[in-house]
Amino acid sequence: MRRPMIASLLLDTLPLAQMPKVTTALLIGALVIFAGIVVVLFIFTSYFGLWIQSVLTGSKISFGNLIGMTFRKVNTRAIVRSKIMATQAGLDDPELTVGALEAHYLAGGNVQQVIRALIAAKKAKTISLTFREATAIDLAGRDVLESVQTSVYPKVIDCPPRGSAKPSLDAVAKDGIQLKVRARVTVRANLQQLIGGATEETIIARVGEGIVSAIGSADDHKAVLENPDVISKAVLVKKLDSQTAFEIVSIDIADIDVGANIGARLQADQAEADTAVARANAEGRRAAAVAEEQEMQAEIAKSQAQVVEAQSDVPRAMAEAFRSGKLLVMDYYRLQNVSADTEMRRALAGHSHDPDTPEETH
């Protein structure tokens, strides 16, 4: 194998003792140069496609930027494509730079979604959205593209939402009739309130509260059935979209049904409660009457005992009267005759002798 001319001349001019060292150094140098060429070729082939795309589209992303993204662990393909989309769409925001895209990517944002949202806002011509606002919305956890689309094309929210435990909003008019309502709320995203503003759940809760209040203030449920638009107007006047991420465009009553007669049910429950109270009061009075009757029977028994005690003293009194001469034998028989006449008259008059009355002791 023929050696190169320069290496041959160098070897011929050097002493024979130094030839092995020079050969080793040349080989090492050749390997280093070869490795460098391989690395350069690898880098060139890896980033040439992205670089040529950026050059042809006017995105102005240099090789140095591409290599730096790799060392910073940034997805170069996502950054280049996002920058190309922004350039082709004519986004002229001065804050929309390669460094800003890298920073948003490293912060955990969705770069391509932000660029798509900016392009959609620019095409709509009615939405003012800057790159800073779009990245802030994206980092706040909101879908910035969906928000822009909702701002352009209003979104319909069911109230109550589909799949909820209660299929309708129940409210009672002043006449006591229950109405079951389902509404549809058309909202448009408010990009200025999207960060920190309330979400769909708040809109649903506020609209439900407004519908219940509007029905509750109606004097007659028939008026609500005849003109459901009364509910929508009453709810829209309250500005329920304040401090929310949406702007309410319209509230439409999708369905309204008549429920139970809550007023009659409440009256029946009240009547039942009044009946229970009256029954309890009557039971109390009956118990008091029974107690009073028992007390009277006790008084009667006490009086009868006193009568029996007094009757037991009569024979002793008569004996004492006989001994003292105050009562003679003829007087006693005369008294017995009068008592017998009295008993006979009672018998003739139909009055039986009271068995509880003790007989007089002779």
UniProtKB/Swiss-Prot annotation:
Q: Where in the cell is it found?
A: Cell membrane; Membrane raft
State if Amino-acid biosynthesis is listed as a keyword.
Answer: no
This protein's source sits in the domain of life called Bacteria
InterPro entries per UniProt: FloA (IPR022853)
Which keywords accompany this UniProt record?
Cell membrane, Membrane, Transmembrane, Transmembrane helix
Locate the transmembrane regions by residue number: 24-44
- Report the HAMAP family cross-referenced here: FloA
Subunit description: Homooligomerizes.
Instruction: Give the family per the record.
Output: Belongs to the flotillin-like FloA family.
Name-wise, this protein is Flotillin-like protein FloA 2
Instruction: Give the source species.
Output: Rhodopirellula baltica (strain DSM 10527 / NCIMB 13988 / SH1)
The gene is floA2
